Every structure is written in structure tokens, then in C-alpha cells.
């Protein structure tokens, strides 16, 4: 049976991807900060979901948390990173920028590095990053969001280049949605 982990499955794109994976025969490890929302998702199909609730800003424990989830799943073939944060920040409140960087850069990198090393060790696997077209341009309304998405795009490209040097069945995919009607896209929707 195919096994996947979806980082950021408590809402939005990640939640819908987890549902699609289950519909297509996967067993899915779901992660997010809001455990109650993960439990609600698990209750839709209790035998197909495994919960690993944690915060990406806790990079010290990401490896332990992911390894625990992999043990529950008895392996993993696909890891989708769909977590992220971004707020409009016209006043340039540094705390908003810092939180965006901690999740979208630091946490993202910790998950990517773990996944890359795990899949390289088993010589097969697929890392999918849900980035954004917002990473292609700056934004006066959400400067750190767009900048962190640019980082993700470039980081995944770097991992893709590393994969070419390996003799394995390891894949890296960057998916760049445009504006999507999710809870994160709140406010006036002026990311771009």
C-alpha cells in the first residue's frame, strides 16, 4: 500500500490533498499545529489517517516527529509540504515577518532536509513542495510571504539538481498555485 505524509493537513490545500490521497488508495500521515482539525480529518476515514501534530517552528523536534509518523505508517513513499503562513503586513511589523520566515523558510528547510535524506537512504521517494506563483514577484502587501515562497522555489530547485547526481528513484516536484480561496488567503487577498 502506498504511504504519504502531508505537512500542513489541518486546512486548505494540504487537507484536500490528504483527502485525495486516501481516495486514491494511500495511507496518509497528517500533520499540523491544530490537532483538533487533524482529528476531524482522521474521523472521516479512521483506518487511513495517522496523526502527527507538531509546529514547524519547533525545528529541534522535526526529525523525531517525522520519524515517529513514519513508524506509525511503516514507511513513506511521498512527502508533501503544504504548510505555510503569510499575512498582509503593510506596516512591516517584524513579528509578522519573523513568523513567516520561521515557518516558510526554517521549518520548510528542516522538513525538506529530513525527507531528502530519508528518501536518499531508501533510494526512492518523492518530495512535493506546494510553493506559490507569489514567489516569482515581490509584494508591497506581504513582502516576507513572497520572499519566502521564492526561497522555497529555489530550495526545491537545488534539491532537484542534487537528485540528478544520485542513482536513485528520488523525485522533487514544485507546485506553484496561484490565488486559492483558503483561510490563509484572508484579508483583502492582496498577496500579489
Language-model segments: which ranges?
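Conserved glycine-rich cofactor-binding loop
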Residues: 10-11
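Conserved glycine-rich Rossmann-like NAD(P)H-binding loop of the short-chain dehydrogenase/reductase
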Residues: 24-40
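Conserved NAD(P)H cofactor-binding loop of Rossmann-fold oxidoreductase domains
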Residues: 80-88
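Short alpha-helical oligomerization interface
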Residues: 89-102
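Active-site helix of classical SDR
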Residues: 112, 148
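Residue(s) in the substrate-gating loop at a strand-loop-helix junction
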Residues: 132
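SDR active-site lid
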Residues: 154, 161-192
Amino acid at each position: 500500500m502506498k504511504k504519504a505524509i502531508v505537512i500542513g493537513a489541518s486546512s486548505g490545500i494540504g487537507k484536500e490533498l490528504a483527502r485525495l490521497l486516501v481516495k486514491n488508495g494511500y495511507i496518509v500521515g497528517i500533520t499540523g499545529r491544530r490537532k483538533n482539525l487533524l482529528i476531524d480529518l482522521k474521523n472521516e476515514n479512521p483506518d487511513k489517517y495517522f496523526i502527527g501534530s507538531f509546529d514547524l517552528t519547533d525545528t529541534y523536534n522535526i526529525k523525531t516527529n517525522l520519524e515517529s509518523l513514519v513508524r506509525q505508517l511503516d514507511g513513506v513513499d511521498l512527502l508533501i509540504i503544504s504548510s505555510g503562513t503569510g499575512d498582509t503586513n503593510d506596516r512591516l511589523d517584524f513579528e509578522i515577518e519573523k513568523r513567516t520566515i520561521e515557518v516558510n523558510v526554517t521549518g520548510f528547510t528542516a522538513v525538506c532536509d529530513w525527507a531528502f535524506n530519508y528518501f536518499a537512504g531508501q533510494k526512492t521517494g518523492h518530495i512535493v513542495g506546494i510553493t506559490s506563483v507569489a514567489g516569482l514577484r515581490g509584494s508591497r502587501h506581504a513582502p516576507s510571504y513572497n520572499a519566502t515562497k521564492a526561497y522555497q522555489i529555489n530550495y526545491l530547485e537545488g534539491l532537484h539538481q542534487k537528485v540528478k547526481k544520485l542513482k536513485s528513484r528520488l523525485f522533487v516536484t514544485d507546485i506553484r498555485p496561484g490565488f486559492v480561496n483558503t483561510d490563509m488567503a484572508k484579508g483583502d487577498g492582496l498577496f500579489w
